[in-house]
């Protein structure tokens, strides 16, 4: 009996060793080994994307102009936060000098201005184009030399269906700026396609974010304002940040090596 138990124990140990040798390695994430720089990462789509990127194995630099919104991300392994005003060209250059050239740049920062052309002042125009277009131009300009040197990279620009894709009521300067983003995206994609750099745009419809809540709550009738936003969505609901983040993961991954200069519409059927 003693000999049997001893042999049985040895047999169990051998089986355990064999099993350890045949266990499959954990699957690598779709962004494993990549670094990503995300603007406006403190909330909404930017935050959801930062978390999705880390889940897929990326090392993330999450930036935002508001330090308070970055605090919870500081606790997430794989994410390093920095306060960044993307309209400050010197600050943009400084962060690239600090972190080096990322494999992925997600230009998510932007501002939704309301009103029609008669309600748009020069100051409104300048603010929207400075944040929605000029800042994006400087972000791309800062990372492109390093991406060229590395032999590739992925740039993702946040646009909107309220652009050259569809006319949306009371979105004059916002739509003009987001149309500019589409033109800029295609131009940069064409210029750098031969150097392994992919440049694509995401064009969402209305997405449930803190900034949307702020706009709704600032309206005379918040309940009706929310109903109006939902009413223009054929699916009967708003998008959520995680859905946009999933698309950003796809565009940042090697799965899209053959996609550049595209406009990825994710709008719940709004442009049908």
Model-derived features: where do they sit?
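Substrate-binding pocket helix/loop in short-chain dehydrogenase/reductase
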Residues: 116-117, 121-129, 229
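Short C-terminal tail/terminal secondary-structure segment
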Residues: 2-27, 249, 260-272
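Alpha-helical segment proximal to the catalytic Tyr-Lys
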Residues: 145, 190-191, 257
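Active-site helix of classical SDR
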Residues: 140, 177, 185
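C-terminal substrate-recognition "lid" of short-chain dehydrogenase/reductases
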Residues: 137, 237-266, 271
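Short, small/polar-rich loop/turn modules that mediate ligand/substrate recognition or access, typified
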Residues: 193, 198, 259-261
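Residue(s) in the substrate-gating loop at a strand-loop-helix junction
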Residues: 160
């Amino acid at each position: 009996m003693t000999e049997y138990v001893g042999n049985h124990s040895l047999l169990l140990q051998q089986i355990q060793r064999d099993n350890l040798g045949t266990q499959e390695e954990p699957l690598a994430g779709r962004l494993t080994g990549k670094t990503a720089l995300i603007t406006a990462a403190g909330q909404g789509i930017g935050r959801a994307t930062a978390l999705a990127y880390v889940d897929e194995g990326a090392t993330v630099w999450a930036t935002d102009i508001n330090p308070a919104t970055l605090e919870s991300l500081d606790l997430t392994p794989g994410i390093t936060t920095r306060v960044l005003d993307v309209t400050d060209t010197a600050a943009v250059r400084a962060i690239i000098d600090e972190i080096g050239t990322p494999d992925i740049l997600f230009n998510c920062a932007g501002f939704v201005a309301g009103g029609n052309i008669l309600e748009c002042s020069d100051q409104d125009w300048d603010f929207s184009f400075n944040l929605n277009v000029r800042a994006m131009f400087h972000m791309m300009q800062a990372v492109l030399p390093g991406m060229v040197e590395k032999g590739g990279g992925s740039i993702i620009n946040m646009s909107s269906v309220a652009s050259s894709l569809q006319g949306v009521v009371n979105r004059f300067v916002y739509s003009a700026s987001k149309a500019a983003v589409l033109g800029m995206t295609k131009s940069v994609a064409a210029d750098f396609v031969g150097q392994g750099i992919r440049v694509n745009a995401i064009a969402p419809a209305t997405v449930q974010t803190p900034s949307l809540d702020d706009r709704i709550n600032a309206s005379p009738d918040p309940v009706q304002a929310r109903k109006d936003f939902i009413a223009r969505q054929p699916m009967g609901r708003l998008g959520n940040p995680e859905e946009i983040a999933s698309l950003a993961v796809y565009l940042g991954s090697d799965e899209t090596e053959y996609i550049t200069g595209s406009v990825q519409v994710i709008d719940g059927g709004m442009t049908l």
